[in-house]
Amino acid sequence: MDEDIKVLERIYDRFNARDIDGVLTALTNDVTWANGMDGGHVHGREAVREYWTRQWTMVSPHVEPVGFHRTVDGAIIAEVRQTVRDLEGKPLQGQTHGLKDKTVGHVFRLREGKVARFDIQDAAWPPR
């Protein structure tokens, strides 16, 4: 299996375990990370830590990669089933943020074996 995909699988595993430090070690110091709740991006490892710490006080997301595809320009797109529950494990109702149950495309750009950029797109599988 591709080493970059192994890195991404570890990131998903550590994210679902709420092991922020386990994820941050796989990111470059200057990472650009999509903010799925509010839009835009956060920049740097500590900003990613703050983003997830805030997110996990409001919702309980779980992300399950079901396929990976490397694009011609070297990015890796993961098709991901995203489920988001409230802190009691119940389905969300009436949320105003962008997180909800759906299948999405996570686009990763790696540099020297670490994630340098992460974006979110609507899932289009197989990728175009």
Where are these regions (language model features)?
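Poly-acidic low-complexity segments
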Residues: 19, 33, 120-124
